[in-house]
Amino acid sequence: MIIDRSDILMQMKIKKAIIENFKGIEHCEIEFGPDFNLLIGDNGVGKTSVLEALSVGLGGFIAGIGDVKTKHFTKDEIRIILENTGDGSYNRRYMTPVSVKCCVELEDQSVEWVRRKNSLTSSRSTVEPRTICKIAEKMANEPGHILPIISYQSTARMWMQKKESSENIFSGKF
């Protein structure tokens, strides 16, 4: 399939993301290349966390598109610090605010917004400034715009699969 680029009105590319207090990430700034980007690292270093944070951050853009559910920060995604109380126990302290700042290029202009949850008890995450929602609404409703795509495959799916039951070898008589 050949795409006639002259029909494209507006496209968006993620240039940079700044992640604060998301899962195991205290602070992380990532700059993205103009085309394909690949995160490589050992197990457990946060590759998937970066992508999950981006999906929440891009939810600020998606919030402008009607009838599309957006992903918010969950309690499990807020970074936790364990504080020793001195008697062999500990307290969990949730590090808020949790935020993702997205910096994108949109028609040769830089556009930035922050998706943030200010406290553990906040019911939703906020998007500031809200102008990104208006831009998304315009892009979704007018033909010729290329909406952003982010795709990742979490290994969490591997652990959630139902295991096949096997025969108990100790159930028979010896």
Label the model's feature ranges:
Residues 1-174:
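P-loop NTPase switch/coupling surface
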